């Protein structure tokens, strides 16, 4: 189910009607985007705390997949908000669009950082370097 992630609340250009309604839908999508990065946090925590090789490989793969999802969602939300901004909008809607673009950029960057952390952990594992000395025995 994770690999099938898609936008639930916003659609292409044909789906934009009233800017205020479009903004509400985009807000829901941004909140859902936040949940994706929260899941990535859990995956990284598992990488740090779980030494089972199979579990760790699963987490590495999930983080890589989720990083791709964050890239895609940022672009799709930004494109949607760009379409909304081309309509006649109020200053308040314009400010909300700018805010959501900033948030989606930050969430995508968080996804990148989690991915970079996972790659660092992977390199650390390959070199048999451990966070805690007792992990060296396993």
Where do the PLM segments sit?
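Cytosolic, long alpha-helical scaffolding segments
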Residues: 1-138
């Amino acid at each position: 189910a994770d690999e099938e992630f898609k936008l639930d609340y916003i659609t292409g250009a044909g789906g934009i009607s009233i800017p205020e309604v479009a903004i509400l839908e985009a807000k829901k999508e941004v909140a859902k985007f936040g949940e994706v990065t929260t899941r990535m946090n859990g995956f990284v925590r598992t990488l740090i705390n779980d030494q089972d090789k199979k579990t760790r490989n699963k987490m590495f793969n999930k983080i890589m997949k989720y990083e791709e999802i964050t890239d895609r969602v940022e672009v799709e939300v930004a494109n949607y908000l760009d379409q909304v901004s081309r309509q006649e909008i109020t200053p308040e809607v314009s400010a909300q669009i700018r805010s959501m673009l900033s948030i989606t950029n930050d969430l995508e960057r968080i996804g990148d950082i989690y991915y970079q952390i996972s790659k660092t952990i992977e390199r650390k594992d390959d070199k048999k370097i451990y966070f805690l000395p007792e992990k060296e025995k396993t």
